[in-house]
Regions:
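Active-site-proximal specificity loops/subdomain of glycosyltransferases
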Residues: 1-31
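Short aromatic/hydrophobic "clamp" motif used to bind/position activated sugar donors
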Residues: 35
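Catalytic metal- and UDP-sugar-binding loop of GT-A-like glycosyltransferases, i.e.
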Residues: 38
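Conserved donor-nucleotide/metal-binding helix-loop-beta segment in metal-dependent transferases, i.e.
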Residues: 46-75
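Terminal low-complexity segments of carbohydrate-biosynthetic enzymes
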Residues: 187-203
């Protein structure tokens, strides 16, 4: 796992378009076979386990039927082990496709957005959210995936911490700093980077 990768370029998108179209216009320009999927408020607060991340890339390389590996456990009701730290993600999961930090086979992530409905990330009702609608698309494409879990503690309502990739999921909730779930981590980042919490409210 290359820990010295530098940003090659920023790929802009049209702010007037919906999330799915924005994402599709960008991912089509990614040349690498695998990509690390993150949202902009997924802030890394500790050193990732690069050795384990490389191991997970090797898992994808050695198993062509797999499309992704989530780097943290979510609301996953089934325990189907693949290895000591990886579990199969049951396709019946309501959030089978999720915006959780994940390693993806780039071409498969592109297909989900290519055939998915043109929606935003968030919506007033569940079926207006791309994350929800894309789960049906992923199932129809035969997408299969795993998730990392190594006994980490639950954080908030929907996520667990991750030893392999320690990050905030999410640092912002509806535009507010998520101090209720990541108070310690965000205070540390505030001190290191001079973040002014007063410029936006917090929850």
């Amino acid at each position: 796992f290359n820990t010295s990768i530098k940003i090659k370029k920023f790929i802009p998108y049209n702010k007037e378009e919906k999330f799915r179209t924005q994402f599709l216009s960008c991912i089509g320009q990614i040349e690498e076979e695998y990509c690390l999927y993150l949202n902009e408020d997924y802030l890394i607060y500790d050193k990732p386990d690069y050795k384990k991340l490389q191991e997970y890339v090797n898992v994808l390389e050695g198993n062509s039927c797999l499309s992704f590996i989530r780097l943290a456990k979510g609301m996953d009701a089934y325990d189907i082990p693949f290895s000591n730290t990886l579990q199969y993600l049951d396709c019946r999961n309501n959030y089978f496709f999720s915006q959780t930090a994940s390693l993806w086979r780039t071409s498969h992530l592109l297909l989900i957005h290519k055939y998915g409905p043109d929606l935003h990330i968030a919506g007033k009702v569940m079926n207006e959210q791309f994350e929800v609608a894309a789960s049906d698309v992923a199932r129809s494409l035969g997408i299969q995936g795993l998730y990392h879990y190594d006994g980490e503690s639950k954080r908030g309502t929907h996520h667990y911490d991750s030893k392999v990739f320690p990050y905030t999921a999410s640092a912002l909730v509806k535009g507010k700093w998520n101090l209720s779930e990541y108070g310690t981590e965000l205070q540390k980042l505030k001190q290191e980077h001079g973040i002014d919490f007063s410029k936006r409210s917090h929850c």
